[in-house]
Amino acid sequence: MSETMKAAIFVEPGKMTVEEVPKAALQQDDDIVIRMVRTCVCGSDLWFFRGLSGQAAHSQVGHEAIGVVEETGAAVESVKPGDFVVVPFPYSCGKGPVCKAGFESVCPHGGYFSACQAEYLRVPEADGTVVKVPGSPEDYSDEQLASLLTGSDVMST
């Protein structure tokens, strides 16, 4: 298995590249790694591309995705390898009072993705973050997959 993957890289305003980068890997027991099925360009991605907001030069981008679970950390209970999932742009623990009140996007244990436009993605706090989708990607048309992707909190452009 390759130790690298292809990923979209923001170079500077107006310039993106696709580069080989280290493959996403588990770092914590509550992580999963997914193989990307679809990702998209969000309206906020266009802000830094146009130079209207900050984004570190030579950094991975993207924060909406659907994919298939490739690997799970030892503490993950909600999904298993082979499961099809939607990955929202904020990740969260799903267990604390903030998350239970419905405010996952401000979870004190959470954060935001900026690496979904790649072949693989590490998802921290997986049990509180991903949403399992019935079946597998092959069960859906391209139009249905595009619709599922909007479930990841896409901001219209």
Give, region by region, the residue ranges found by the protein language model.
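Short structural boundary motif marking the start of a folded domain
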Residues: S2-A8
